């Protein structure tokens, strides 16, 4: 910390002896390129909390969300032991989002000049949607600057639907390949897709790795394969993870969480969750059938939730109070860096 203070010329101010507020005095690109990337998670979390707090002062409705997730169908074909939406654990009704409802949401985002992420998963598998390409195409038509992402387990990917979603205009296809052996060969359907579709649509220099970034000029796709353990133990997902029990002795210590400040999750019946960990949308912030997206985002439920998280408590939410998610994604480079740049330039 002392070295950071010296090199970056910033001061730490303790408020109510509960958390640090960071005031940046001088803009340096070296901070974001080095110190932010390698800073401890708690320091990153403090930075994000400060950014969110400052945003709330400048705009009573907080900054706009950066990612909209559509759960088009409440189903997954995965068998992950850590997820209550997996085949062996699924207890939700099977609901498919009406296309008219989807159109309403996309047109509202277009009217807002939305340029963030559009994705088609919450706790679901997007490639189970037979006409997924139609949903993608509609979003691409009306949100030309948005980043359209497909995150899939790859089980239902084939040359036919793979070709359709690429032609419809996705920017990114990321595959989580779950297996007990992280060195196992890729599934045959993935190899076939790469050979018959991916490498026929794109030259190798048009295929990038990673997530949302500035769009390259010309033809491109971001393509990722992440090897994941089928029986991995992650967070308790607000108490819903089948393979991890909540540790009540530590649940009150996590405090601030970034999710309700940049996520907007819509499930098949139009309900909006407070975050992606609310598997059953049990505490809806609103419903896009009856309200606008902006009304929900700026509504009383979201506002109160954010205020409580900024004060460092999760106890006022039944979901948050039993969640052991640290409160910050890893690595959180894109969103936080952009927000950090903004603060540096405007202070």
Where in this protein do the model-derived segments appear?
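Conserved glycine-rich "GG(E/T)P / GGGxP" loop and the immediately following alpha-helix
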Residues: 62-243
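C-terminal accessory region of radical SAM enzymes
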Residues: 196-248, 252, 277-328
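Short, acidic, Ser/Thr-enriched surface-loop or helix-capping motifs
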Residues: 266-267
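Short, small/polar residue-rich loop motifs at catalytic or cofactor-binding pockets
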Residues: 258-260
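N-terminal pre-core extensions flanking Radical SAM catalytic domains
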Residues: 1-91, 276, 293-298, 302-303, ...
